[in-house]
């Protein structure tokens, strides 16, 4: 196993895109159950209000967790994209510097 660290901007951008897709899917999944408590109250009437209140509490907790995960994925997407840009600029700058030090034949 090699101890060399190899970083490619393409791989960082690929990982960034995956985090962006994950954030979008998490946002969609988080919203899927919105309104279940209201529907329960509407379809089952006052007898279901205790259950509907419990469902509402679970929905709030689920929404908070989902929103937190979306935020983390979005932040990671941004950080990976920023890192890719920095690696690209560093590679380009150092390549130019190296080209300047090599004497033509």
Swiss-Prot record:
It comes from the Bacteria. It holds the Pfam family T7SS_ESX_EspC. InterPro entries: EspC. One of its GO terms (biological process) is protein secretion. Disruption phenotype: Loss of DNA conjugation when disrupted in recipient strain, strain does not secrete EsxB. Transmembrane segments: none annotated. Belongs to the EspC family. May be involved in assembly of the ESX-1 / type VII specialized secretion system (T7SS), which exports several proteins including EsxA and EsxB. Involved in DNA conjugation, in at least recipient strain. DNA conjugation in M.smegmatis is unidirectional with distinct donor and recipient strains; mc(2)155 is a donor strain while MKD8 is a recipient strain. Mutations in a donor strain that alter DNA transfer do not always alter DNA transfer in a recipient strain. This is Uncharacterized EspC-like protein D806_0056. It comes from Mycolicibacterium smegmatis (strain MKD8) (Mycobacterium smegmatis).
């Amino acid at each position: 196993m090699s101890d060399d660290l190899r970083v490619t901007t393409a791989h960082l951008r690929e990982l960034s895109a995956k985090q962006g897709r994950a954030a979008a899917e998490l946002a969609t999944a988080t919203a899927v159950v919105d309104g279940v408590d209201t529907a329960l109250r509407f379809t089952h009437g006052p007898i279901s209000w205790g259950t509907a209140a419990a469902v509402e509490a679970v929905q709030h907790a689920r929404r908070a967790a989902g929103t937190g995960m979306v935020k983390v994925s979005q932040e990671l997407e941004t950080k990976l994209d920023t890192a890719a840009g920095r690696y690209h600029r560093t590679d380009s700058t150092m390549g130019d510097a190296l080209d300047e030090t090599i004497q033509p034949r």
